[in-house]
Amino acid sequence: MNLTFLIPTRIETEDRLRNIISSVTYLLKHTDAKVIVKEVAPHNTFLFRGLSEVKKRVDTSNLTSLYEESNDPLFCKSKVLNDLIIESDTKFVANYDADCILPVESYHQAYYALDSGQADVVYPYQCGVYQWKANYNMEIYNSFMNTLSTNVLDKEKQLSNSTIGWTQFINRQKYIDCYMMNENFVSWGCEDDEFYFRMSTLGNRIARVNNYVYHLEHSRTHNSWFSNPNFNNNYHLWNTIKTFDRQQLMDYY
């Protein structure tokens, strides 16, 4: 695969640590793509507590782990994704939420849609009610890590809505040409909406894979919920941008 998974992270809780260990291991097991993790946080938790767990189970020669020390309480996912886009060197990239797991075939179908020239952006799940919210306690975590199979996640799951978050597969040059991520969206909220709107408005062909996405459930901090102190700013920015036509959007960027 001429593909790199871009995983921005700040590991603020034990369940988020389990989730990134799980998703990175799963990606390395089931694809031959590159994976780059960039942690921006006061401490390099992934390197010192996560990486060894991944190495117990899979070859990590395709994995790169980056770290930037930061005491800023707000995690700017958009900025970290932009850093990762520049760091990558493959024809295609995938923004990837560390709490996201897909059926194995979905990765390959999304990649094929890009590689065959059918699409510029692929959402590897359907829009509607195609999210499995998977309970991910220690017992399920241990079972999943031993099998690396979504069958384990099917034991305790709840159907929920799915729209535009989690992960997107993208032609890297198109991504750059369309201004990458908007770093004015700080911490959590509305950045995924704006990205979809912009890629569509600028003429990219957007496709979907007809399947589900699993979300490994976790506790929420201000960096992953409406309690983000910058959420209102993000919301107002999105409400402004979504009124733009193509030329106004290009002028803005």
Language-model-detected regions and their locations in the chain:
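Cell-envelope/extracellular polymer assembly enzymes that use nucleotide-activated donors
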Residues: N2-L6, K34, E194
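Short beta-strand-to-loop acidic/aromatic patch adjacent to the donor-nucleotide binding site
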Residues: K91-I101
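Active-site acidic short loop of glycosyltransferases
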Residues: S88-K91, M180
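N-proximal low-complexity "stem/linker" segments adjacent to membrane-targeting elements
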Residues: M1-Y26
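Glycine-rich, basic loop-to-helix element that forms the pyrophosphate-binding segment
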Residues: N71-E87
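Acidic donor-binding segment of Leloir-type glycosyltransferases
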Residues: Y26-E69
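Conserved catalytic core of nucleotide-sugar-dependent glycosyltransferases
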Residues: P103-E183
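C-terminal catalytic/acceptor-binding lobe
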Residues: R16-N19, S162, N184-Y253
